[in-house]
Amino acid sequence: MTTTYDPFHPSYLDESDLREEMDRVFDICHGCRLCFKYCTAFPLLFEYVDSFDDQDASRMTPTQQDAVVDECFQCKLCYINCPYIPGLHEWAVDFPRLMMRAEQTMVAKHGTSVKEKLQNQALARTDLVGKVNVALAPIANKAISKPGSLTRRIMSKTVGIASQRILPPYARQRFSAWFRKRTTRQPATVAGKQGKVALFPTCLVEYQAPEVGKDLVRVYERNGIECSLPAGQRCCGAPWLHNGDVAHFADQARDNIKVLAEAVRQGNDI
């Protein structure tokens, strides 16, 4: 059994090692139960373990373990509130990253279906999807704004986005476009040392909520902090990682690290 959350660790994709680690963590979670209200993964986990007379989490079958994994959607509320996380406790529990390890192990062992591959390609290419939908914002927003509509039902069948889920609308202008078109970029002069930051806007701010980034820039500049937006940034790659595709995630992470590392060398905070 190896407690590791490093996707390049030699035991990371070892299924038997993973199953033993899930036994350990599930037993801790069952004894704690602090996270019963955060997502359906925990009530399902507790239901399985409670069904055993001795309440031994290691008696869960691989199918039951996988069912718990499927319920996790990486909101990370459990991690924020967990008293046993790495660095704070010797048990080093990181439930979201363990679920991610399980997803990646299953993909490495069993692969994915053609439908899943197509869905992953559609959902993980957030920069492409974002650029297209911002350019067609009036049309795109009308198409996705009504839960349960024909368009949303088609999306549910094809790319796997639940038809009843409320989706954030796309902006008519990307955050990066707004930032580079501004006529006044210099921060206000204030007493004390002036700082410098390089912004990493995230896909949500870049394509759907640029007002969040705009407010951040205005607050920083009002307080004498110079803002820059390094060119060449990409999606953080989280959709690839959550789909079990470490290779694509690592490619995007390397690109972002290269860009942001240069910004740090120029004296910026991120």
Give the predicted meaning of each segment:
Residues 35, 40-45, 78, 83-87:
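Detector for the c-type heme attachment site
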Residues 21-37:
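Mature N-terminal segment immediately following signal peptide/propeptide cleavage
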Residues 23-26, 56-235, 240-270:
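Iron-sulfur-cluster electron-transfer modules
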Residues 1-20, 40-64, 193-196:
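Short, charged low-complexity linear segments at domain edges
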Residues 27-30, 40-44, 221:
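Short amphipathic alpha-helical segments enriched in leucine
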